[in-house]
């Protein structure tokens, strides 16, 4: 999943039954045409991937609640059974948002600018977590006590839906969401509020109306249904199993060799990346 074959890999398998599953947009993890052509099935959230063997699909990702990353160590604080049997947590706080103080790209810049406007508008009613703000170990602690969470994806595109949204459902938290443009293919439209962080004034008006209408209090059933869907239908293993169920196991096996990904980091690409990062650093400086 999202890892390139680093060395040639050979195995006995029907070529049609080799599977690649991607979980990042093209600008983060790109794949060449020659690389994806090696696989019989490609499940991808990258809309520009073409071919009869390509299936557009939401990323296959784990959830990040119930996992403590404190001090660089990974500790599992809640099992599947814990999450499945857990009742709705006590909601003592209003809104949380996770971001970081990184400001290298336009996406970083837009997200930070939006969060600053949220802080100015909501004051102590909103808690901001992430690098450069309030640190945390287990994402459960920044979702479970809150009625609402503002979930901001790293990019906005069809099919790019990550744990930023689904973790909200595991904690029975109502998501205010920027990201996947066809999320309603997976979750009902009444299960989240879609906003545009590039239009902060309109987004804040929508959030205010959401809170005023007590949407969280009136969404218990739909949030519970989405929680079950995340845990039972969209967990990693279930998604892999569904793909495997579509394969034809009667196809004859042969010796198949998957070749490594060609190098893509040319000097031109590196220069463009550095220029982009420095541009947004300069733009973020006061008076520039």
Identify what each model region corresponds to.
Residues 5, 27-28:
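Terminal end segments
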Residues 27, 133-135:
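Short acidic loop-to-helix transition motifs that present clustered carboxylates
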């Amino acid at each position: 999943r999202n890892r390139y074959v680093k060395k040639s890999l050979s195995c006995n398998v029907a070529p049609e039954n080799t599977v690649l599953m991607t979980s990042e947009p093209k600008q983060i993890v790109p794949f060449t045409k020659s690389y994806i052509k090696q696989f019989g099935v490609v499940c991808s959230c990258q809309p520009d991937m073409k071919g009869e063997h390509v299936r557009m699909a939401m990323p296959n990702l784990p959830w990040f609640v119930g996992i403590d990353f404190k001090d660089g160590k990974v500790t599992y604080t809640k099992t599947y059974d814990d999450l499945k049997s857990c009742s709705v947590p006590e909601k003592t706080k209003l809104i949380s948002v996770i971001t970081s103080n990184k400001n290298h790209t336009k996406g970083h810049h837009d997200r930070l600018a939006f969060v600053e406007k949220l802080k100015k508008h909501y004051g102590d009613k909103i808690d901001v977590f992430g690098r450069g703000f309030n640190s945390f170990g287990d994402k459960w602690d920044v979702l479970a006590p809150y009625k609402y969470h503002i979930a901001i994806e790293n990019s906005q595109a069809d099919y790019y839906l990550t744990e930023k949204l689904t973790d909200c459902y595991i904690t029975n938290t109502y998501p205010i969401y920027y990201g996947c443009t066809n999320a309603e293919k997976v979750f009902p439209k009444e299960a989240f509020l879609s906003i545009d962080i590039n239009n902060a004034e309109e987004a804040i008006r929508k959030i205010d109306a959401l809170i005023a209408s007590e949407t969280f209090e009136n969404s218990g059933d739909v949030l519970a249904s989405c929680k079950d869907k995340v845990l039972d239908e969209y967990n990693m293993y279930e998604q892999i199993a569904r793909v495997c169920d579509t394969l034809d196991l009667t196809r004859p096996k042969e010796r198949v060799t998957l070749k490594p990904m060609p190098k893509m980091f040319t000097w031109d690409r590196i220069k463009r990346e550095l220029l982009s990062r420095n541009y947004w650093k300069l733009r973020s400086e006061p008076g520039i």
